[in-house]
């Protein structure tokens, strides 16, 4: 995606994912967003069986996820910049995170008080903003 088009594309994407029937999907996903704090142990951890199906491909994460979606639960792990959760998308900067935000409802799902307080603000007051082990869990991200 060309840098000059990113800002316009991101703004269009946010409009697309926050209105109409897609807006309902985004609000449902956003209502389930969780900020997971340090030392968190999931109550669902017991009985988990890892089948070692971990892939680290050199490709767009959403394209890879689409290829694997039929084989069970699929997750995309992506490191967020706590200073700008859109990855610069809304400012027109090109980055992997910006493209992911432009192609999905990820940014509207993260653009909430819960994420700003539990992830962005918390990270801001660390010695270095990347010292946090917190993560943002967004179930059912919709991608186009």
Each language-model region and where it sits:
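Macrodomain-like recognition of ADP-ribose-binding/processing modules
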Residues: 1-144
């Amino acid at each position: 995606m060309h840098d000059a088009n990113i800002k316009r594309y991101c703004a269009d994407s946010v409009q697309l994912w926050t209105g109409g029937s897609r807006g309902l999907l985004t609000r449902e996903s956003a209502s389930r967003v969780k900020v997971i704090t340090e030392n968190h142990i999931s109550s669902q951890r017991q009985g988990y069986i890892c089948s070692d199906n971990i892939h680290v491909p050199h490709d767009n994460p959403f394209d890879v996820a689409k290829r694997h979606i039929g084989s069970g639960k699929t997750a995309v792990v992506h490191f967020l910049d706590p200073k700008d959760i859109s990855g610069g998308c809304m400012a027109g900067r090109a980055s992997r995170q910006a493209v992911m935000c432009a192609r999905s409802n990820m940014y509207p799902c993260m653009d909430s008080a819960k994420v700003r307080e539990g992830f962005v603000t918390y990270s801001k007051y660390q010695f270095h903003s990347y010292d946090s082990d917190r993560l943002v869990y967004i179930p059912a991200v919709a991608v186009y």
